[in-house]
């Protein structure tokens, strides 16, 4: 009987964002859900200061050892003068068939790690460099959505150069009395503030500029319902059932504290009961957003639904969480795809996209050279 070769998966997690520990919990769940008869899994923890630990060292942290201690031991083994020292352990993983990154936020969702995988010529789960970078930047995301006629909230972009031109009175005239202030390139609700007066506006803008040199000021939606959808696929993606997040009435929005410090007052409705018409509209908007941004593999799309039932696309998450309370896998579970099957499908999509992109030519081919062109086969 022929023995089937296992697929070697590199599970990369951690990172330098505020979601470092969340990423570790996501990685634990993904690892536990993987069929070990089908996959060999190597673990790679990216420390907070940007050093990739070896599989053996990552497993020690996985098993509960202190990350800083293990990282110090690992870094001592590598020539610090080598500019590639931080990713040395990845360079030793020559037989990896596919990478599964689950680094949330900075470095993981902004196109950085995807560019590294491209240089390594390795398949990877999730969207490519461009789609990741555009989706991580809230301003660029909104520009794409607006160009495609996909409803999103009105906003103004502040930079160090134009910041002085947008005092609170100017913002009021454009967006109303109540606004949200957000760093353009941040996740986890870090640096986000709601402002309803001059001082709140000044304080919120000052804090947001600590995290990015581009800050969004957005109109608020009165009493919104926060709804989410999971998308899975490449050229022909499918959408999950919808879910909703309920935060305590005393809280202004689903903020960093709700997510990571004290989530005791937060509840999730999966699936959420909405009208058929609204459900269809949100689902269609999700698929349109996915296509407009050129997303691949997976994404979770967040919406704000106004009191009168009008949905607005909020944010797009290209590497959503896989923790016990994360909605991305929960929504698929409610739709009929269990955790293990979801992981299998994501890996299959990564391999499919890699081979699809590998058919493209990157060097000049003369028009009379039909040898290369004849090998092209349109993707089904």
Swiss-Prot record:
Its main location: cytoplasm. Mg(2+) 1 binds at residues 302, 315. GO terms for biological process: cell wall organization; peptidoglycan biosynthetic process; regulation of cell shape. Pfam families: Dala_Dala_lig_C, Dala_Dala_lig_N. Coiled coil: none annotated. Transmembrane segments: none annotated. It catalyses: 2 D-alanine + ATP = D-alanyl-D-alanine + ADP + phosphate + H(+). Binds 2 magnesium or manganese ions per subunit. This is D-alanine--D-alanine ligase. It comes from Levilactobacillus brevis (strain ATCC 367 / BCRC 12310 / CIP 105137 / JCM 1170 / LMG 11437 / NCIMB 947 / NCTC 947). The lineage of its organism: Bacteria, Bacillati, Bacillota, Bacilli, Lactobacillales.
């Amino acid at each position: 009987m022929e023995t089937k070769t296992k697929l070697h998966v590199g599970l990369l997690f951690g990172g330098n964002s505020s979601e470092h520990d969340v990423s570790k919990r996501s990685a634990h769940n993904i690892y536990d859900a993987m069929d070990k008869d089908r996959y060999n899994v190597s673990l790679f923890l990216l420390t907070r200061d940007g050093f990739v630990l070896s599989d053996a060292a990552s497993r020690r942290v996985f098993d509960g050892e202190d990350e800083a201690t293990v990282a110090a031991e690992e870094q001592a083994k590598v020539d610090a003068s080598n500019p590639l020292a931080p990713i040395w352990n990845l360079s030793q993983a020559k037989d990896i068939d596919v990478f599964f990154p689950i680094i949330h936020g900075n470095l993981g969702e902004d196109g950085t790690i995807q560019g590294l995988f491209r240089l390594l010529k390795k398949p990877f789960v999730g969207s490519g460099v461009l789609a990741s970078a555009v989706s991580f930047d809230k301003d660029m995301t909104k520009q794409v959505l607006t160009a495609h006629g996909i409803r999103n909230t009105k906003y103004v972009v502040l930079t160090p150069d134009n910041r002085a031109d947008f005092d609170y009175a100017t913002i009021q005239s454009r967006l109303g009395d109540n606004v949200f202030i957000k760093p353009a390139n941040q996740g986890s609700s870090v640096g986000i503030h709601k402002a309803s007066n001059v001082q709140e506006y000044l304080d919120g803008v000052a804090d947001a500029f600590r995290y990015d040199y581009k800050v969004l000021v957005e109109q608020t939606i009165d009493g919104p319902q926060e709804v989410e959808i999971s998308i899975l696929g490449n050229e022909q993606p499918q959408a999950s059932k919808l879910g909703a997040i309920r935060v305590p009435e005393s809280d202004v929005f689903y903020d960093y504290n709700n997510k990571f410090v004290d989530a005791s007052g937060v509840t999730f409705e999966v699936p959420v009961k909405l009208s058929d018409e609204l459900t269809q509209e949100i689902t269609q908007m999700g698929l349109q957003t996915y296509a407009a941004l050129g997303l691949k593999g997976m994404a979770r799309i967040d919406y704000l639904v106004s009191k009168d039932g009008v949905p607005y696309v909020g944010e797009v998450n290209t590497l959503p969480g896989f923790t016990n309370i994360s909605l991305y896998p929960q929504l698929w579970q409610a739709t009929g795809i269990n955790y293990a099957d979801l992981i299998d499908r994501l890996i299959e999509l990564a391999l499919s996209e890699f081979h699809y992109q590998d058919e493209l030519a990157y060097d000049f081919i003369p028009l009379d050279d039909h040898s290369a062109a004849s090998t092209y086969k349109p993707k089904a």
